[in-house]
Design a protein with these regions (language model features):
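Alpha/propeptide regions of enzymes that mature by internal proteolysis
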Residues: 75-77, 91-116
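A contiguous strand-loop segment
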Residues: 1-93
Length: 116
């Protein structure tokens, strides 16, 4: 079970635990600006905000569990197996895999309003 928490104060507090009895070889990952993110259906993005978080890194691609970008926007990937829906690829849509969502959003959004 994972827990995420956000505190609304004058400052920014965000936290999350990965409460598992086993490891996915997670590590602190820092992705600098202009590091190429290779998305499965959306090509490569090398023009994005820097971010830091916990990730499993595969082939140089950080698969973030949670992260915060340089603008202060934070995001966590939580597990909701009973309500998750995975759609087929659709033309003329942004086709983002679930494991790509955090770098996709945090790479281009400065605020929750932009992310919506």
């Amino acid at each position: 079970m994972c827990t995420a928490i956000r505190l609304t104060t004058r400052d920014h507090y965000f936290g999350r635990n990965l409460d598992l009895e086993y490891s996915y070889q997670e590590t602190v990952a820092i992705t600098p600006r202009r590091y190429p993110f290779h998305f499965r259906h959306e090509g490569t993005n090398s023009d994005h905000f820097a971010m830091i978080g916990m990730a499993f890194v595969v082939g140089g691609m950080p698969l973030y569990y949670e992260a915060t970008n340089e603008k202060g926007l934070s995001m966590a990937g939580l597990n909701f197996p009973a309500s998750a829906v995975y759609h087929d690829v659709k033309p003329d849509c942004a086709n983002i895999a679930s494991f790509e969502l955090i770098p996709y959003i945090l790479g281009q959004c400065e605020s929750v309003q932009e992310a919506k």
